[in-house]
Amino acid sequence: MGQAALNILPVTAQLLVEGGDKRIKLDPLRGVNRYGCGPTPDPNLLDYSSATASVISTTAFAAANRLRERLEQDMRYLTPDAIYERELARMRRELLALCELGDLPEPDIVFAASGTDLHRIAAQLTQAATDRPALVLMVDETETGSGIRAAITETSPGIQVAAVALRKADGLPRSAAEIDAHFTELALQAHAAGRHVLLIQADISKTGMIAPSYGCTAALQQALDSQLDVLVDACQFRIAPATLRACLARGYSVALTGSKFVGGPSFSSALIIPAGTAGQFRQRPFPRKLANFSAAADWPDCWPVREVLERSWNFGLLLRWDAALSELRAFRSLHDVDVTRFLQTFARAMQARLSGNPAYSVVAVPGLDRSALLEKPGWDQVQTIFPFQLYRATDSGRQVLNAEQTLQVYRDLPTAALHCQLGQPVNYSAERNALRLCLSARLVVQAVANDGKDANRIITQALTVLDQAARLANLT
């Protein structure tokens, strides 16, 4: 965050990697961040990595560059903190419109650099809103952000964190009933011990799962009433507006990022808090520990933050969110029926290739069930993250790649002759990591626009990326 007005802003590529943490700092030798993404467009990259991060598109970079130019002009007569506040207010309005939330009492939107910071903020708000000690109940870290648990406990040592595994030791998913029972047991135990519970509902996890079920979350909300807060971890942003509205209508806060499915640059996050829940939080003293992670303008002006948070600014966050909104705008222009049709066609093609070729095995993902929220399913019922295990050919058949070998394939993909990228490996069972082929909103726009003329190209490219991963597996 800036601390003094500048006469000239850094160039767009530099601003895009400022105002985050070490994860988006560029490797001086390779020119990419920890997620393998540089700060400028790479039109030749076959990018199917959106569960982790995406390289910025030409369109999104142009949007960020236009904003940078406007910021620089405005700094001649406005202070940076005033500009920052104005731009975030604009982005709140556009995000509300793009998420089609106009039929609800207006929720509050809090901006932050990362999804990790959103979880930190939610935990702090929960702790501040109750006189009881708090328990955060979440899915195991193999299926969510690796630093979330540490971030919560470091910021709030008095908060306990409990986690539920979504997969068995062999990598197969636990049944929904088993997962729900585990969440319920831990929540009821905490409640009986006098704790307030923050339940983090994963939608979608690293391998594409929803947990606990929304039915379980609703039952816990009824049982624990005011002693339960719910945060929907939708940081992948693989949810339709109807799903988001349904969550907010039930009083659930929702964490989103612009850098996963939407395809914007890494480190652009937003916490959407329903009006009723926000009103309850605002009645309590604002958590002073958030001064290290928030600026005053990150919060709507109805929050009592001015005595706690600095009037600082983060122009890198502005550019990253503006880039993400340009991608979301294009995606929201599509008809849901066309999106659903393409997603289903794509999913069938990926499942056929992954299950019908000895170079891969499918990492099972249960169906996406949001029936407790909505009677009519939307496009977000269709799988868009495809985790798979790689094998290399041997004289006797095939041999599974271990975690180190899988990581090497992941690292080699962007630098190979065929320039491509997959989602980071996920440890889904003992000694085994899955790569993830992922659809992004940008790819869906390319496939569906122009009457779907490019749909086959997007599918063929994805199959080509899988073929390249198989070739590299045989070289490890």
What are these regions (language model features)?
Residues 3-28, 32, 59-117, 125-132, ...:
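Conserved N-terminal alpha-helix of the aminotransferase class I/II PLP-enzyme fold
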Residues 43-89, 159-195:
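Low-complexity, highly charged intrinsically disordered N-terminal segments
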Residues 60-70, 85-91, 176-188, 211-222, ...:
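Well-ordered, non-membrane alpha-helical segments in soluble/globular domains
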Residues 110-113, 119-308, 314:
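Conserved PLP-enzyme active-site core in the AAT-like
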Residues 259-379, 466-469:
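Active-site C-terminal subdomain of aminotransferase-like
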Residues 361-416:
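Conserved PLP-binding catalytic core of the aspartate aminotransferase-like
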Residues 406-439:
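Conserved PLP cofactor-binding pocket of PLP-dependent enzymes
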Residues 426-476:
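PLP-dependent enzyme catalytic core of the Aspartate aminotransferase-like
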